[in-house]
Amino acid sequence: MTIVNLAAYHFVSLDTNEQWRPLVTARCNELGLRGTILLAPEGINLFIAGTREAADAFIAYLRHDPLFEGKFATLQFKESLSDSQPFRRMLVRLKREIITMKKPAIKPELGRAPFVDAQTLKTWLDRGHDDTGRPVVMLDTRNAFEVDVGTFDDALDYRIDKFSEFPEVIDANRADLEGKTVVSFCTGGIRCEKAAIHMKEIGIENVYQLEGGILKYFEEVGGAHYHGDCFVFDYRTALNPQLQPTENVTCFACRAVVTPEAQQSPSFVPGQSCPACAPAASAA
C-alpha cells in the first residue's frame, strides 16, 4: 500500500488549542492517520501519514472545517510517498512554540518574514548580488550535523547544536550580516522563517527567508550553488538535489549521519555503532 506523507507548518495566532486538541486527535484516529501535530500560540507544525483518501480528507478538514475559523485556509502541504507507514502512533501535542527558539513567541499577526523564491535566489547567486547590488549572504539555520551533509556554497554556518542557540550566535556575529542581503535557509522553511523574523525584530536589515527551504529549492532549480545532499528527519536520512534518497544512513546508537565511505569502516555495525560513537563506546 502506498502511504502519503504530509508535512506542513503555519505561523498564525491560535488561542483555542486546548479545546481543539481532543477534536483533532479524534478526527486523525477516525482517518487512520499517524504522526505528530504540534499546536502552539504561534501556529501549527505537523508531520503525519496515511492513505491517499485519509490525507485528502485531513487537508480538507484543516482548511475548511468551521472549527478552525479559516485560520488554516491557506495552509500549504508538502507531500511524499512511501511503501510503509513511517510513524508508530498519532500524537497531538500542545507546545509553547512550534519550533523551539526559547524566545517569546513571534507575533504572526504582524505578517511573515520577507521571502525569496528559488529562481530569484539562483539569479542572485549566479551574478553574486541581489537586484540592488548588495552582496548576498546565505545563512544556514540548521544544526551542525545537518550542515555537514550538504549546504549552499560559502554559506555562513555557526555550528549550532540546536535551534535555540540561534539568537545568541546571531548577537555574537551580527557584523557578518551588516550591509548585506541575508537569506536564511533550512530544510523545509520553518526554522529559516522564524530566524528571519527574529533578525528583523532585532533590527538586522535586508533579511529574507528561502521560500520552502532547501527542498523547494531542489524541486525548482536543482542543486545550483549547493554542494552535497540535504539531511531530512525521517527514514530516508538525506535527499540529493533530484529529491532522491541517498546512500547515507542514520546510526541507530548516536543518530549521526553515516556516509557510504564511513559505512566501510569496521566501526560501523548496523544497529549498534558507527565511526562517530564507536570510540566512545569502546572507552566506556
Curated annotation (Swiss-Prot):
The active site is at C186. GO terms for molecular function: oxidoreductase activity, acting on paired donors, with incorporation or reduction of molecular oxygen. The gene is trhO. CDD domains: RHOD_YceA. One of its GO terms (biological process) is tRNA modification. Belongs to the TrhO family. It catalyses: uridine(34) in tRNA + AH2 + O2 = 5-hydroxyuridine(34) in tRNA + A + H2O. Keywords: Oxidoreductase, tRNA processing. Residues 132-226 form the Rhodanese domain. PROSITE patterns: RHODANESE_3. It comes from Burkholderia lata (strain ATCC 17760 / DSM 23089 / LMG 22485 / NCIMB 9086 / R18194 / 383). Pfam families: Rhodanese, UPF0176_N. Catalyzes oxygen-dependent 5-hydroxyuridine (ho5U) modification at position 34 in tRNAs. Its EC number is 1.14.-.-. This is tRNA uridine(34) hydroxylase. Signal peptide: none annotated.
